[in-house]
Amino acid sequence: MKIAYWMYAGPAHIGTLRVASSFKNVHAIMHAPLGDDYFNVMRSMLERERDFTPVTASIVDRHVLARGSQEKVVENITRKDKEERPDLIVLTPTCTSSILQEDLQNFVDRAAMTSQSDVILADVNHYRVNELQAADRTLEQVVRYYLDKAHRQENLNQPITEVPSVNIIGMFTLGFHNQHDCRELKRLFQDLGIKVNEVIPEGGSVENLRNLPKAWLNIVPYREVGLMTALYLEKEFGMPYVATTPMGIVDTAKFIREIQHHINKWAPILLGKVVDYEEYIDQQTRFVSQAAWFSRSIDCQNLTGKKAVVFGDTTHAAAMTKILAREMGVYVVCAGTYCKHDAEWFKDQVQGFCDEVLITDDHTEVGDMIARVEPAAIFGSQMERHIGKRLDIPCGVISAPVHIQNFPLGYRPFLGYEGTNQIADLVYNSFTLGMEDHLLEIFGGHDTKEVITKSLSTDSDLTWDPESQAELSKIPGFVRGKIKRNTEKFARQNGMSKITVEIMYAAKEALNA
């Protein structure tokens, strides 16, 4: 355990609550002290939804510590059962309340005797897993619970649908553009003549989980959440799954071809023909997606060789690295992820597309790396946006965790062919246009702008005299930071504490030599 003012992935109970609050008519009870109950506020602030967050905190206070939690937890479960009439109540402790080592499964069993709702305890180790791993595990646990229940009630043996159909697994609350991506995937499947059987957990009903085996295959757009469920369904029901993320022209085509491959196993029997989506891929790539011709335009060629850094969750960071390097000719200096548990897959995906791979959940390491490589643009999470502002480097947000501006009201998917257009816009608009800053300074656009330096350190042991500062301000903005850093580096190496114009020229000569 460590103290941090920023975490890329939150504690395990946040993942469990995200899954529970994504389903319709499911209530979560969080057994936690005050301070751990911020999920309601966070979700209400960020998600553009009208409904209240269905999460109740069962507070661990001094009375609970003195008498034990059973009475209070059982009372909260039965009260919510009577008030809300949910289909399912999920009880989760937090990492703090786990210290009490209470038998919460016993509390759940007690409450289930008097409740009309189903009651389960989230089966998550709060010290071993983070938010994303816990969400993946909880979703699989809920699906397994309801399919086992349907099996016991003998209403599970349903034939697969007559037309090709899919389940979309892993769309959930507070995800990065998840709702827009879901709409785009539904539109894509409609174009291909594929029926969407169920979408879980976002907007899904636990009572409909027994319908999951009716689909021909499962779609897992994001590796972080949904993979465990897809593996369970494959093992128990023989359902194939596609885990390729349809992000970018190349991977969207690969995604559609994988679906075609799986559908054609059943199509000759059930449809009397095989399906062929090649014409659709060609049509979308050449005429619907603007990204293919944009990547050949002079605007995109201006980006060729520009340096970029990519950091985020494994799904988005890997996909973005491949799009930049393969489809846009951008030079990715470093690609990284905070999902340390999936590091091997990430390294395998970005191999050959970037110079350096960074696997860390420490934002200071990411900041230091960005300051060191000095990219022209960053593609990352909310934290990389902050780092970019401090270093005066533009940043495009491509991954959770994000703030309110990345829960847009307008339609902005990142998946599918419309997603390729959004990504092309994001990439192009993230790079500072050549002489823009310099021209603004020349014509008085930024007359109050200070001379900036790209460094994460706020302390400097060097002073610049007025003449050298005036000389520095004459240098164009897009190279000024580099010259300032090189001069300061030269001064430190030679034991100088005050920088003059002469030292600036000496540093320039030393660098050229």
Curated annotation (Swiss-Prot):
> Which subcellular locations apply to this protein?
Plastid, Chloroplast
- Copy out the cofactor comment: Binds 1 [4Fe-4S] cluster per heterodimer. The cluster is bound at the heterodimer interface by residues from both subunits.
The entry's keywords: 4Fe-4S, ATP-binding, Chlorophyll biosynthesis, Chloroplast, Iron, Iron-sulfur, Metal-binding, Nucleotide-binding, Oxidoreductase, Photosynthesis, Plastid
Kindly list the cofactors needed. [4Fe-4S] cluster
Annotated residues that bind substrate are located at 434-435
One GO term of the cellular component aspect? Answer: chloroplast
Q: Quick check: keyword Acyltransferase in the entry?
A: no
Q: Which SUPFAM superfamilies match?
A: Helical backbone' metal receptor
What's its EC?
1.3.7.7
Q: What does this protein do?
A: Component of the dark-operative protochlorophyllide reductase (DPOR) that uses Mg-ATP and reduced ferredoxin to reduce ring D of protochlorophyllide (Pchlide) to form chlorophyllide a (Chlide). This reaction is light-independent. The NB-protein (ChlN-ChlB) is the catalytic component of the complex.
Q: What is this protein called?
A: Light-independent protochlorophyllide reductase subunit B
Organism whose genome encodes this protein: Staurastrum punctulatum
**In the UniProt record, what gene is named as encoding this protein?**
chlB
